[in-house]
From Swiss-Prot:
Provenance organism: Dictyoglomus turgidum (strain DSM 6724 / Z-1310)
Name the record gives this protein: Large ribosomal subunit protein uL18
NCBIfam families: L18_bact
Function, in words: This is one of the proteins that bind and probably mediate the attachment of the 5S RNA into the large ribosomal subunit, where it forms part of the central protuberance.
Example of a GO cellular component annotation carried by this entry: cytosolic large ribosomal subunit
PANTHER family: 39S RIBOSOMAL PROTEIN L18, MITOCHONDRIAL, LARGE RIBOSOMAL SUBUNIT PROTEIN UL18M
Keywords, in A-Z order: Ribonucleoprotein, Ribosomal protein, RNA-binding, rRNA-binding
Protein's gene: rplR
Assembly behavior: Part of the 50S ribosomal subunit; part of the 5S rRNA/L5/L18/L25 subcomplex. Contacts the 5S and 23S rRNAs.
Matching Pfam families: Ribosomal_L18p
Family statement: Belongs to the universal ribosomal protein uL18 family.
GO molecular function, one term: structural constituent of ribosome
Length: 122
């Protein structure tokens, strides 16, 4: 019997396939992106230690006050700028981008472009 896999399960499989190839190091940590139906999250992770070095999301109170909606492209752009600013303050300039199994389009692309514009290299 053939059972169709859910979109969420297919995204997880794509993410595992990507994670086989992408790892974050102390010199070049991983910029991981996750989006839910309501918010968008970004974190910079050192995979050798398993530590999150920097994080930002549209769930944060200071970002929500600046946004009309927490789930649109404008929110993703703001999260990208904030994550880049916080990373540069910690001395992180180069990262590896992990799209988290999501298509590189729309919100994910907007976050990546704004992080690049704010000074992160990837």
């Amino acid at each position: 019997m053939i059972i169709k896999r859910s979109r969420k399960e297919l995204r997880r499989i794509r993410h595992l396939r990507i994670r086989k190839k992408i790892t974050g190091t102390p010199e070049r940590p991983r910029l991981a992106v996750y989006k839910s139906l309501r918010y968008i999250y970004a974190q910079i992770i050192d995979d050798t230690k398993g530590h999150t070095l920097v994080a930002a999301s549209s769930l944060e109170k200071e970002l929500r006050s600046q946004l009309k909606s927490t789930k649109n492209i404008e929110a993703a752009k703001l999260v990208g700028e904030v994550i880049a600013k916080r990373a540069l303050e910690k001395g992180i300039k180069r990262v590896v981008f992990d799209r988290g199994g999501f298509l590189y389009h729309g919100k994910v692309k907007a976050l990546a472009d704004s992080a690049r514009a704010a000074g992160l290299e990837f």
